[in-house]
């Protein structure tokens, strides 16, 4: 059975993948990705906490998101979601995807906007009272470990940033420029 990628009832995993692929090609930000994913998921956006309630949940988190915002890491399965179905609809429209995403996704988002489907759990919901989110590793700890390994190997290393964000093609171009400068 699916857990992490589990879509909301009415949306197939294939349709969820189509939306994810379309968002990727559109240049959507990670926050935009997460907003849409949370609203077509049965697990993300606080739903794991809601399903686990009233149990105590201890979530040990490895973050690959700059700044470690808990609602963005893995799309926040155990934290309140500040976004709405309306936000997800606006993101798809902003990127020109609303009319091209699967009909099942549009239907779920519209049903959510109308209140037919419940909104993701929000700040103040009792389901979060016994949830403990602990970041045990992130981009900074990984970057520092890599840097120390380089030094230990007797190589000259330079840690430029653990907080780099942007489109991979743009960041890659920047790193290539730095490498050419160092080599010159």
What are these regions (language model features)?
Residues 1-9:
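Hydrophobic alpha-helical hairpins/lids featuring a short glycine-rich hinge
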Residues 2-3, 40, 69, 167-168:
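Flexible loop/turn segments at secondary-structure boundaries
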Residues 7, 72-75, 130, 159:
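Generic preference for well-ordered secondary structure
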Residues 9-13, 17-22, 26-101, 107-108:
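Internal gly/pro-rich beta-alpha loop/helix module
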């Amino acid at each position: 059975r699916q857990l992490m990628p589990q879509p909301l009832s009415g949306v197939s995993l294939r349709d969820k993948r189509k939306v994810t692929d379309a968002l990727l090609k559109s240049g959507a930000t990670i926050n935009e990705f997460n907003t849409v994913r949370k609203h077509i998921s049965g697990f993300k956006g606080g739903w794991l906490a809601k399903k686990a309630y009233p149990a105590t949940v201890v979530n040990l988190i490895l973050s690959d998101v700059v700044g470690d915002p808990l609602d963005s890491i893995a799309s926040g399965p155990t934290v309140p979601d500040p976004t709405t179905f309306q936000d997800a609809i606006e993101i798809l429209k902003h990127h020109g995807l609303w009319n091209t995403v699967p009909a099942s996704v549009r239907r779920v988002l519209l049903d959510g906007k109308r209140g037919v489907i419940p909104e993701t759990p929000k700040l103040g919901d009792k389901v979060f009272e016994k949830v403990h989110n602990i970041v045990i590793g992130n981009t900074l700890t990984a970057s520092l470990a890599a840097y120390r390994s380089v030094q230990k190997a007797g190589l000259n290393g330079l840690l430029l940033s653990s907080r780099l964000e942007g489109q991979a093609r743009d960041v890659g171009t920047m790193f290539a420029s730095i490498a050419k400068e160092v080599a010159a």
